Amino acid sequence: VAIDGLPTFDEWLSLAFSRFRNHTKSNDHFLSFINLTESLYAEIKTTYPETFLLHGDLHHENILRDDAVGWVAIDPKGVIGPKIIECGRFIQNFIEDEIPSATSLGDATDKEIMLILEERLKVFNNVTGFDQHHLAMVTFIDQVLSTCWSMNSGQVVGLRKIKLIKNLLNDV
């Protein structure tokens, strides 16, 4: 699918990562995550070569229930990429909302976070039919991209969630 004026997911990754490499130059550890992300995304594109118009920011707070029309996705970014990419943001966002004792991700234990991620992978596998390992891959890809955007804008960002999601790649 080619739609004039809309970016591709490839472009999102390329722009964010080249900006990080050329300007942010924060740390080698995060660069290793970028390198892994590029490798994982190449595998995703090979496995899922067909592209679609995606929302680009599909997560819990961007899906609302409207009494007149039913469920509505709001705040679309519009990006072209493999369908499976859309799952990553939903899987990795708002984990703390499912942990009763946590008001932020920092309040949750690694085990609690991993249990939520593993459950979400199972649910998305059951609903979409996408392979759990591929779902873990796109979750990692999305988290690294989101973190890169934050770092490129000068925010101080922890790498804990990236490290935990990376562990999923070995577990599923």
Predicted regions and their residues:
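Residue-level recognition of alpha-helical structural elements
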Residues: G5, S26-F30, H133, G154-K161
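Active-site Asp-x-Gly
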Residues: D66-K122, N126-H133, M137, V156-L159, ...
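ATP/Mg2+ or Mg2+-diphosphate-binding catalytic cores
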Residues: L145-V172
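Short amphipathic alpha-helical interaction patches enriched in hydrophobic/aromatic residues
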Residues: F20, T24, I95-E98, C148
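Short, well-ordered beta-to-alpha junction loops that form the rim of enzyme active sites
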Residues: G56-L58, F140
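Conserved ATP-binding subdomain of kinase catalytic cores across diverse folds
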Residues: V1-D10, L121-H134, T139-L145
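An alpha-helical support segment within catalytic cores of ATP-dependent transferases
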Residues: A2-G56, D66-D67, N126
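Hydrophobic residue at the +6 position relative to the catalytic HRD Asp in the kinase catalytic loop
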Residues: E61-I63
